[in-house]
A protein has these predicted regions:
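Short capping motifs at secondary-structure boundaries
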Residues: 97, 104, 113-124, 313-321, ...
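Acidic helix-start/capping segments at beta-turn-to-alpha-helix junctions
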Residues: 121-160
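Sec-dependent N-terminal signal peptides
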Residues: 18-28
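C-terminal motif of bacterial Sec signal peptides marking the signal peptidase cleavage site
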Residues: 34-35
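Short, structured beta-strand segments at or near domain termini in extracellular proteins/domains
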Residues: 473-487
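N-terminal secretory signal peptides that target proteins for export/translocation
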Residues: 1-17
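Post-signal peptide N-terminal segment of mature Sec-exported envelope proteins
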Residues: 44-70
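Functional-site microenvironments in short loops/helix caps that host divalent-cation chemistry
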Residues: 40-45, 66-67, 71-73, 78, ...
């Protein structure tokens, strides 16, 4: 019997997409609540004083620090004619956000991988082909009405004493290594499906269904033809291969701004060999992600696409725990390039690094970060490859490893003219490359430099880039979350 490759959907897919419909619903609910309040006489003699409301203080997200809003001079502080670096900073401002204290570790990313594994097992335990235990999937509400099915996470997987069908379901996500003969998790099955609503595209006037609302200048004629939009979708073939397509069609409603992605979440452990030819890095390939000794090291071999999938899962994981209160949190995401640089430099427009000095070491010769101190010498700073996160002192914002250790993905797309294209208020340039786009359109900005880079390349004011589907032994990531605050 051919084994099916299962794809796991995030819980967000079981909810109405949060587009303008969702936002309108939230506003309507708020207005309804306000209208149901007791209509007390105004203490201002009939003057409009506004509706009442409780104060709100956002709790600190686990493992994150608050980066207060601020302005700074973004870009190279100091030029270098030898390397073609031109000092051309520009003033920008960013709003407040939460940022992970450290890079995402192997341990945290494993939690994501194991969640996907357990989701597949639960899906199969509910499948009639594996015994059909209906307790693992909820298909009716409390009144017995049919609903869109979702997995029951309150039902534990029978790891210790499974019956025959349960054992088949559990073992179906594992494979026997043809070389070692050991049973191991099958990475090819670990696919995560998620949906992202494109709020920016949905808000643009040119994409409104009502032509009279696309242009307010009455001197300009507006076509009655429906706008043409592009959206990403994905599916699995019968062989279990991921297929991605970009569809262009006439706009029909908010659901057309909902993009679907399928991402295999397992890191590329072979990156250690492919990044360094003629080097003995096999132990890293075998052990770096799988061995518990590396749990607190930054995850690597993760593409920009996988980092985004993790961010979506992390958001959904928290919202599922918070219940109704979860709708009020901002999603976890990759930082914009401007946010990343501001956090790395701790808002200091004069600093090239996360520290104030121009050298990467103090007066005692102790290094401030994990990088390549000199040609051929990786170990002078005490490490050969990556180091445990938080090994070195944090910057003035309390954030660790913003220089060296691993370079970090940002959400920002790369183009040579990016500084001319972006605003000076929360600057960001996004380009969702279609599958058919030239490869150069799939470049994303990475920041911070890594354990393999010289001091020049771990400067906080310099950018680099990588293709969004590449998985490198020197690129990881961390998350941010926009602050809900009005101080």
């Amino acid at each position: 019997m051919m084994k099916k490759t299962m794809t796991i959907y995030s819980r967000s897919q079981r909810r109405t997409p949060r587009g303008s419909l969702a936002m309108a619903g939230a506003v309507a609910a708020g207005l309804l609540t306000a209208s149901c309040m007791s209509m007390r006489g105004s203490s201002a003699g009939g003057e409009v004083t506004g509706v009442g409301g409780s104060t709100f203080a956002e709790p600190t997200p686990y493992g994150m620090v608050l980066v207060d809003r601020g302005g700074y001079a973004m870009g190279p502080v100091k030029g270098d004619s030898v390397w073609g670096i031109k000092a051309d900073p520009r003033g920008v401002s960013v709003d407040a956000f939460w940022m992970d204290e450290t890079e995402i570790t192997n341990s945290k990313y494993k939690q994501f991988v194991f969640w996907v594994r357990d989701s597949i097992i639960r899906e199969r335990l509910a499948d009639p082909a594996y015994g059909g235990n209906e307790a693992f999937k909820i298909e009716e509400d409390k009144e017995g009405n049919p609903i869109k099915p979702y997995l029951n996470w309150n039902k534990p997987i029978p790891w210790r004493n499974p019956n025959e069908d349960e054992e088949r379901a559990i073992q179906s996500v594992y494979r026997t290594n043809p070389i070692t003969g050991r049973r191991e998790l099958d990475p090819t099955q670990l696919n995560y499906v998620y949906e992202i609503f494109n709020h920016t595209a949905a808000a643009q006037r040119k994409n409104r269904l009502d032509p009279t609302r696309r242009e307010y200048n009455t001197d300009i004629p507006v076509s009655d033809e429906l706008p043409i939009i592009s959206k990403d979708t994905a599916y699995l073939t019968e062989e279990g291969e991921i297929r991605r397509e970009t569809i262009s069609r006439a706009l029909t409603g908010d659901y057309d701004f909902l993009n679907t992605y399928i991402v295999n979440v397992y890191p590329d452990t072979t990156c250690w060999i492919n990044d360094f030819e003629n080097a003995y890095n096999e132990p890293y390939t075998r052990m770096y992600f799988s061995h518990a000794g590396y749990n607190e090291y930054p995850v690597v071999g993760v593409s920009w696409e996988q980092a985004n999938a993790f961010s979506n899962w992390r958001t959904d994981f928290l919202r599922r725990t918070l219940g109704r209160e979860g709708i009020y949190i901002e999603p976890y995401r990759l930082p914009t390039e401007a946010e990343w640089e501001y956090a790395a430099r701790a808002g200091n427009s004069e600093s090239m690094y996360p520290w104030e000095e121009t050298l990467p070491m103090d007066e005692r010769g102790c290094f401030y970060a994990n990088f390549k101190p000199r040609d051929g010498d990786y170990v002078l700073d005490g490490h050969v490859i990556t180091s445990q996160v938080g090994t070195y002192n944090p910057n003035d914002f309390g954030i660790y490893d913003m220089a060296g250790n691993v370079s970090e993905w940002t959400s920002t797309a790369y183009t040579e003219s990016i500084d001319k294209l972006t605003s000076d208020l929360n600057p960001e340039y996004r380009y969702d490359a279609a599958k058919e786009d030239p490869y150069k359109m799939k470049r994303k900005i990475v920041r911070g430099g890594s354990w393999k880079d010289a001091a020049l390349n771990v400067r906080s004011d310099l950018r680099s880039w990588e293709y969004q589907n590449e998985q490198r032994s020197y690129i990881g990531f961390r998350n941010v979350r926009s602050q809900i605050g009005f101080a």
